[in-house]
Amino acid sequence: MVELYQKLLGMRRIKRKISWRVSAKPVSEEDLNRDLLASKLLKAGDVLMVHSSLSSIGNVLGGPEAVCRVFQRVLTESGTLLMPTYHQPEPILKMIKKGSLVDLRTAESTMGKLTETFRTIPGVKRSSHPFSSVSAWGRYSKEMTSGHENSPYICGPGSPFAQLIERSAKYMGIGIDIRVIALYHVLEENWSDFPLRVHYPKPFNVRYIDPSGNRVERQLIILDPAVAKTRIDREVEGAWIRKWLTNYMRTKGILHGFKVGQANSWIVGSQSFYDEMKSLAIRGITIYTTEREFNTIKKEG
């Protein structure tokens, strides 16, 4: 009964979303291009990671293909565009246990229609990770998708995420909040003095087919779900830290808000965001900090 209710509720939400997109004012490529340029936050040659909710932009003429073209047009081939082409880890791990292999040449992104469309564009390259791959287009696409297989950590040294820091990339969200920023985990997995243990203590073996068609077997270290109960991406438990951190980064001049079509959007500089998160962690404030812990830190500090 509960499952049926959840299914019906999900169908109603989808119908409302489709109805809103159809009735919304059409958004053209020129509109999107104008929005990006008017923000004065992007330029040719930038390295940019984009997370998105396509439906939040509105009724985009040309669909996700048009959105991809606009970003390519703004960044030009001298820039680099990246998008997450993740899968949920649980189904992938179940597949592996059953002896099946995820094939990164064909496996679809579960991060939305825009990311899946981007993945299939000619010239786009994909990193070698069974459930946290990144796809990239442009000048550094090969370099930024190479090396993901060399670290057991998702955001470890050489990963596309760590390279965002090294290349002074910009990080953008369209119609979504800051829970999606992977730079949090770059800090956890590259700074030895991070104040919490957030990973399983032991690695586990995974097998998959990489974007070149090679069978890969290697070890991975993943985040511990038990520790993640209060993390920033948790809908209820993480709501307070999302709100506080958004305001904090905006006040610091690190997070900049603007519109893309109908979507409330934001952009941060990867290096400045990383540095500020490190400064907060030194004070004991992380994406896992509860509101009670935060208030205690404030009283003591």
Regions found by a protein language model. Give the residues of each.
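Membrane-proximal basic amphipathic "stem/tether" segments
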Residues: 1-24
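Internal, conserved structured core segments that host functional sites
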Residues: 91-183
